């Protein structure tokens, strides 16, 4: 009857919430390794970047990461497009890939973006499809990027 179903749903939600979190925090601290630039005659530029470092989460996982991507700026230094992929290895050697992009915006928009976990091994299989909103701060060549990730289903 009804009671059994409600009890079942309750335990099911309890069980699944211990398996994986509906949302989690993910933070990287990294260093810019390469930053290759093509300057356009009229002032725009195309930047190819690579940074690497460490990440930590509030779901008990931490490890190392590297990201590669490209950014296109217009002649007023406004972001036109950005596209990147990151490879993450946690403390158990399990890997997940996140990809993101940012579109046209002001200088301020430049520091905020979205990414998604598109592939994962082991533990991370349950997090495929999660969307993360991140903010980026630079101190010289060091990158700080806290993110909030949510189940998008």
Language model features by range: what are they?
Residues 9-14:
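Bacterial N-terminal signal peptides
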Residues 20-153:
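Beta-strand-enriched cores of mature, soluble protein domains
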């Amino acid at each position: 009857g009804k009671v059994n179903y409600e009890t079942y749903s309750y335990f099911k939600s309890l069980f699944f919430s211990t398996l994986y979190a509906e949302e989690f925090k993910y933070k990287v601290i990294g260093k810019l390794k390469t930053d290759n630039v093509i300057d356009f005659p009229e002032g725009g530029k195309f930047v190819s970047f690579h940074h690497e470092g460490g990440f930590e989460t509030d779901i008990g996982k931490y490890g190392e990461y590297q990201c590669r991507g490209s950014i296109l700026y217009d002649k007023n230094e406004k972001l036109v497009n950005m596209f990147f992929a990151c490879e993450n290895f946690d403390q158990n050697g399990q890997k997940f890939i996140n990809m993101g992009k940012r579109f046209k915006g002001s200088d301020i928009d430049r520091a905020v973006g979205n990414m998604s976990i598109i592939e994962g091994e082991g533990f991370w299989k349950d997090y495929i499809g999660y969307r993360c909103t991140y903010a980026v701060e630079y101190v010289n060549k060091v990158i700080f990027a806290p993110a909030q990730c949510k189940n998008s289903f």
